[in-house]
UniProtKB/Swiss-Prot annotation:
Residues 117-325 form the ATP-grasp domain. One of its GO terms (cellular component) is cytoplasm. 1D-myo-inositol 1,3,4-trisphosphate binds at K18, H167, K199, N297. Keywords: ATP-binding, Isomerase, Kinase, Magnesium, Metal-binding, Nucleotide-binding, Transferase. GO terms for molecular function: ATP binding; inositol-1,3,4,5-tetrakisphosphate 6-kinase activity; inositol-1,3,4-trisphosphate 5-kinase activity; inositol-1,3,4-trisphosphate 6-kinase activity; inositol-3,4,5,6-tetrakisphosphate 1-kinase activity; inositol-3,4,6-trisphosphate 1-kinase activity; isomerase activity; magnesium ion binding. This is Inositol-tetrakisphosphate 1-kinase. PANTHER family: INOSITOL-TETRAKISPHOSPHATE 1-KINASE (PTHR14217:SF41). Belongs to the ITPK1 family. One of its GO terms (biological process) is inositol trisphosphate metabolic process.
């Protein structure tokens, strides 16, 4: 039975490109059938004049990044948005700006995943160790790599996890290849995963898993192979094919992701960040069968998710039906306050045998990482590609 919510108003802001790509007008029509009015916001004008608003859906990632680069217009837009949020704590924001900023920084999001894994203590999950490279590599860099379990081949990504440049990546096979890398960037150990990526598209408590091709397997250890530079977005398009994804044969373990594991990771991220609309890229280690989270994306494209609008409307309906919207907002942000504080605020205990504390030089920042999940290599990396819908489930 459908719930009718007459008088409720949902505002949204996203780029015209994303509006067209999602065909968001269809979502607005779906909402109106439930009595919900949908309003496209103009951030160049006072939001107060466009209210009242019960929920705001946004994709402000580009604007936030431009504001961080001191673009005056973007700074004004973000400030206007923030001012409205502070003046209207009863309005539900999908999703909170602090959470979006975390997901825009790969170093921060990888650290969050590491803490989530430590908190969950699930041996079926082990994401790659990573380093943040702040300056050009030297001999000390190689020593830190070796000391902390990062092994060739390595995957190099931009620290910023959004925008065209964020898809520019490299696979580095030897020390010589490191010299050509331009910092700042994030480095992860690559792990073979039989050229399969699982993209998890989350909408509140529901998620859909889409299977896509990924990078083929590469042998562990340094080699004289030249570095491979590529654009992961081009490799990942559903209609694309690439020699980088051509798998000659399946090697080692070939397992599909476990629903229980995905549900747990999704729930932990929702609780830690208070987010509802995000994507998780997962690969399966072909030596251990462990799940590795290799990227988290704010408000992804939801390609291959035919029921995205239905899931989104159901999620909005659920949060609007809660007794007190202000209480609801605090629950969204604080549901996992205990978990969030432990994951995001509390430094890991130095006595914890699973944690390697930061050991840095002036040029390299090594994030704390779990060791022991794979004695030979650590899982890795961000890759996507062509798609078929795999599974749909509820994360509760």
């Amino acid at each position: 039975m459908q719930t009718f919510l007459k008088g409720k108003r949902v505002g949204y802001w996203m780029s015209e490109k994303k509006i067209k790509k999602l065909n968001f007008q269809a979502f607005a029509d779906l909402c109106r059938k439930r009595g919900i009015e949908v309003v496209q916001l103009n951030l160049a004008k006072p939001i107060e004049d466009q209210g009242p608003l019960d929920v705001i859906i946004h994709k402000l990632t580009d604007v936030i990044l431009e504001a961080d680069q001191k673009d005056s217009e973007s700074m004004q837009l973000v400030q206007r948005f923030q001012d409205y949020i502070e003046a209207h704590p009863e309005t539900i924001i999908l999703d909170p700006l602090p959470a979006i900023r975390t997901l825009l920084d790969r170093s921060k999001s990888y650290e969050l995943i590491r803490r989530i894994e430590t908190y969950m203590q699930d041996e079926r999950i082990c994401s790659p160790p990573f380093m943040e490279l702040m300056a050009e590599c030297d001999e000390d860099t190689l020593k830190i790599l070796e000391k902390n379990g990062l092994a060739f081949p390595l995957v190099c990504k931009t620290r910023v996890a959004h925008g065209t440049n964020s898809h520019e990546m490299a696979i580095i096979f030897n020390p010589e290849g490191l010299w050509s890398i331009k910092p700042p960037c994030v480095i992860q150990s690559f792990i073979s995963h039989n050229a399969v990526l699982y993209k998890v598209f989350v909408v509140g408590e529901s998620y859909t898993v889409v299977e896509r091709p990924s990078l083929k397997n590469f042998s562990l250890g340094a080699s004289d192979r030249a570095s491979i530079f590529f654009n992961s977005h081009n490799v990942s398009k559903p209609e694309s094919s690439s020699v980088l994804t051509a798998l000659e044969k399946v090697e080692g373990v070939f397992e599909r992701p476990c629903d229980e594991v995905i549900r747990g990771i999704s729930k932990a991220l929702r609780q830690a960040l208070g987010i509802s609309l995000f994507g998780i890229d997962i690969i399966i280690n072909n030596k251990t069968g462990q799940h590795a989270v290799i990227d988290i994306n704010a408000f992804p494209g939801y390609e291959g998710v035919p029921e995205f609008f239905t899931d989104l409307l159901n999620h909005i309906t659920t949060i609007l039906q809660r007794p007190d919207q202000s209480a609801n907002k605090s629950s969204v942000e604080q549901t996992g306050s205990s978990l969030g504080e432990r994951l995001c605020c509390t430094p890991p205990a130095r006595t914890d045998p699973w944690i390697v504390e930061t050991d840095t030089s002036g040029s390299v920042k090594l994030q704390s990482q779990r060791l022991g999940c794979n004695s030979s290599v650590s899982p890795s990396f961000q890759q996507h590609c062509v798609a078929s819908l795999a599974t749909k489930a509820s994360s509760q």
